[in-house]
C-alpha cells in the first residue's frame, strides 16, 4: 500500500543530496538525525516541493468524530483496532497519525531499505495528525451502523483515517483492524499480562515471501484476515451486549459507553487492496456482514472456491491506473444474475488515492511517488466515500439522505467510469503468473 521502492529512494535520497550535497560518505546519520536544523531543512525542502494541501481531510458529515485504540486480549491471537465514532466532544486533541516509531521502521522494511529510511520517514511524518478527537466520549442516544475495515499489504490500522473519519462523521462506528497475519508493515502485542501492564510491546513486522511461497501464504493470510474481521465484529457486539471486556491498552476511554450503541442489523465490511480481497473472503464466511465494499481490490490471495459463496451485495470501487485484466476477470467471477454486484472506476486515480499517504505530500512529490493521480486527491476520496455511503444506505436499510449519491453507484459522474476501463476480452491473457506479484498492493 506504500509507493514503489525505487521512487521512494529516488525522492528521499534526492532530498538528502540537496541538503548535504558534499561528503555524503562522511555524514554520521545518527548525529544528524538529532539535528533540528537538519530536520528543518528536510521538511522545508519537502514543503517547497509539495505546492498543495498536505492534511488529511475532515469528515463531511454532521457528526464530530472521536477516535481511540482498542486491544482485546493482549496476545497476538487477540484483536487490535482503531475505532472511529460519532463524538460528543470536539475539544480534544487531534489523533497522532502514526503513533510509534516501529511503524516507520516497518515501512522501511516493506520498502526493502535501510533502517535509516524509517527514521527519515518518522522525521517527515511523525508529528502529523488526523482530524479526530482522541479518546473523546461517544455521542449517546443513537444506535449506529458498524463498518469493519481491512487495510492493505504493508499498511496498518491508522493509514485509512480519511475513510474512517468521513464514515464516522456520517453516523457510523468504524473498526479499522490491524492484521496479525504479518501482512502489516508492523503491529504489536504483549507476551503476557505483566508485559501489558507496563506497556512492554512485542513487535511483529512484515513477512517477506519467496516467490514460490506467494500462492499458498497469501491465501493463508487472507483467510486469517477474514477471521480477524469476524473476531473484531464478535468482540464489538459482545461489548454492545454489555459484556465486560478489558482493553489491554491503558487508555482513558470507557468501553461501557459502547453498550447498546450498535445497530446489529446494519453491519458492513470495507477494505483496500489486500483488504479488498479480505472483504470478499469475509463475506463468504460470515453472514452477519450484510454487504461489502472492495476498494481497488487485489484478488490474487483468494481461492477459486470463494467466488460462488458470496450472497451479500458487493461493490467494487477501482482506480484507473492500478487494475489489470487478470484482476478484473477475477472480480467478474463474483458476478451472478441473482446477486447485487456493482463496479465503478475513478478517472485519473491511482492505487494510493484510497490511503492517507495521498494527503501526506503535495503535488510534485505525490506524483513522483505515485501517491497521487491526475485527479485531485480530495475529489477522488470524496467520490469513493459518497458512493460507499449510497451503497451502504441501500443495502443496510439506513434512513439517511445518502441516496442523493445513488448516481455514483452507477458511475454517473464526469470523474467516474461505469464498470471498468480495462479490456478483458482477450482470452489469451494469462490470469496470473506463477508468482502472483505482477501487481502488488
UniProtKB/Swiss-Prot annotation:
Q: What is the effect of changing residue 117 to A?
A: Reduces the association with LDL particles
Keyword Disulfide bond carried by entry:
no
Phenotype for residue 304 to A: No change in activity
What modifications follow translation? N-glycosylated. Macrophage-derived PLA2G7 carries sialylated complex-type N-glycans that hinder its binding to HDL particles.
Outcome of mutating residue 369 to A, per the record? Answer: Impairs the association with HDL particles
Please describe, based on the UniProt annotation, the reported consequence of changing residue 286 to N: Diminishes activity
| Reactions mediated catalytically | a 1-O-alkyl-2-acetyl-sn-glycero-3-phosphocholine + H2O = a 1-O-alkyl-sn-glycero-3-phosphocholine + acetate + H(+); 1-O-decyl-2-acetyl-sn-glycero-3-phosphocholine + H2O = 1-O-decyl-sn-glycero-3-phosphocholine + acetate + H(+); 1-O-dodecyl-2-acetyl-sn-glycero-3-phosphocholine + H2O = 1-O-dodecyl-sn-glycero-3-phosphocholine + acetate + H(+); 1-O-tetradecyl-2-acetyl-sn-glycero-3-phosphocholine + H2O = 1-O-tetradecyl-sn-glycero-3-phosphocholine + acetate + H(+)
| Keywords tagged on the record | Asthma, Disease variant, Glycoprotein, HDL, Hydrolase, LDL, Lipid degradation, Lipid metabolism, Phospholipid degradation, Phospholipid metabolism, Secreted, Signal
- What does the record say about induction? Up-regulated upon monocyte differentiation toward macrophage lineage.
The Enzyme Commission number assigned here is 3.1.1.47
Tissue specificity annotation = Plasma. Secreted by macrophages (at protein level).
Which GO biological process annotations does it have?
A: lipid oxidation; low-density lipoprotein particle remodeling; peptide hormone processing; phosphatidylcholine catabolic process; plasma lipoprotein particle oxidation; platelet activating factor catabolic process; platelet activating factor metabolic process; positive regulation of inflammatory response
Q: Which domain of life is it from?
A: Eukaryota
User: Is Protein biosynthesis among this UniProt entry's keywords?
Assistant: no
Q: What family is this protein classified in?
A: Belongs to the AB hydrolase superfamily. Lipase family.
Under what name is this protein listed? Platelet-activating factor acetylhydrolase
Amino acid at each position: 500500500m506504500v509507493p514503489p521502492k525505487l521512487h521512494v529512494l529516488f525522492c528521499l535520497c534526492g532530498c538528502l543530496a540537496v541538503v548535504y550535497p558534499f561528503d555524503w560518505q562522511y555524514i554520521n546519520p545518527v548525529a544528524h538525525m538529532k539535528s533540528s536544523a537538519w530536520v528543518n531543512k528536510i521538511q522545508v525542502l519537502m514543503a517547497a516541493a509539495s505546492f498543495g494541501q498536505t492534511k488529511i481531510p475532515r469528515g463531511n458529515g454532521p457528526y464530530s468524530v472521536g477516535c481511540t485504540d482498542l486491544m482485546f486480549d493482549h496476545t497476538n491471537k487477540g484483536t487490535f483496532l482503531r475505532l472511529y465514532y460519532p463524538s460528543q466532544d470536539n475539544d480534544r486533541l487531534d489523533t497522532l497519525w502514526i503513533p510509534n516509531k516501529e511503524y516507520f521502521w516497518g515501512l522501511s522494511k516493506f520498502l526493502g531499505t535501510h533502517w535509516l529510511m524509517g527514521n527519515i520517514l518518522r522525521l517527515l511524518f511523525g508529528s502529523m495528525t488526523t482530524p479526530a478527537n482522541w479518546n473523546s466520549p461517544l455521542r449517546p442516544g443513537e444506535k449506529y451502523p458498524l463498518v469493519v475495515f481491512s487495510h492493505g499489504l504493508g499498511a496498518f490500522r491508522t493509514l485509512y483515517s480519511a475513510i474512517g473519519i468521513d464514515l464516522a462523521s456520517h453516523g457510523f462506528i468504524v473498526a479499522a483492524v490491524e492484521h496479525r497475519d504479518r501482512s502489516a508493515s508492523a503491529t504489536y502485542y504483549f507476551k503476557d499480562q505483566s508485559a501489558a501492564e507496563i506497556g512492554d510491546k512485542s513487535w511483529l513486522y512484515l513477512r517477506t515471501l519467496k516467490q514460490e511461497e506467494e500462492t499458498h501464504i497469501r491465501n493463508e493470510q487472507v483467510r486469517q484476515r477474514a477471521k480477524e474481521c469476524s473476531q473484531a465484529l464478535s468482540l464489538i457486539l459482545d461489548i454492545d451486549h454489555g459484556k465486560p471486556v478489558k482493553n489491554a491498552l491503558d487508555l482513558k476511554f470507557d468501553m461501557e459507553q459502547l453498550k447498546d450503541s450498535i445497530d446489529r442489523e446494519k453491519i458492513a465490511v470495507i477494505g483496500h487492496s489486500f483488504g479488498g480481497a479480505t472483504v470478499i473472503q469475509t463475506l463468504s464466511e460470515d453472514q452477519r456482514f450484510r454487504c461489502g465494499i472492495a476498494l481497488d481490490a487485489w484478488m490474487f490471495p483468494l481461492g477459486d472456491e470463494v467466488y460462488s459463496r458470496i450472497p451479500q451485495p458487493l461493490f467494487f470501487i477501482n482506480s484507473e491506473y492500478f487494475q489489470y485484466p487478470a484482476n478484473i476477470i477475477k472480480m467478474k467471477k463474483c458476478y451472478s444474475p441473482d446477486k447485487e454486484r456493482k463496479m465503478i472506476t475513478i478517472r485519473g486515480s491511482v492505487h494510493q488515492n484510497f490511503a492517507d499517504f495521498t494527503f501526506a505530500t503535495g503535488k510534485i512529490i505525490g506524483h513522483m511517488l505515485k501517491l497521487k493521480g491526475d485527479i485531485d486527491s480530495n475529489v477522488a476520496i470524496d467520490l469513493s466515500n459518497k458512493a460507499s455511503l449510497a451503497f451502504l444506505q441501500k443495502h443496510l436499510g439506513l434512513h439517511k439522505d445518502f441516496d442523493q449519491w445513488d448516481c455514483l453507484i452507477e458511475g454517473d459522474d464526469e470523474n467516474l467510469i461505469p464498470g471498468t476501463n480495462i479490456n478483458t476480452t482477450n482470452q489469451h491473457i494469462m490470469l496470473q503468473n506463477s508468482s502472483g506479484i505482477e501487481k502488488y498492493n
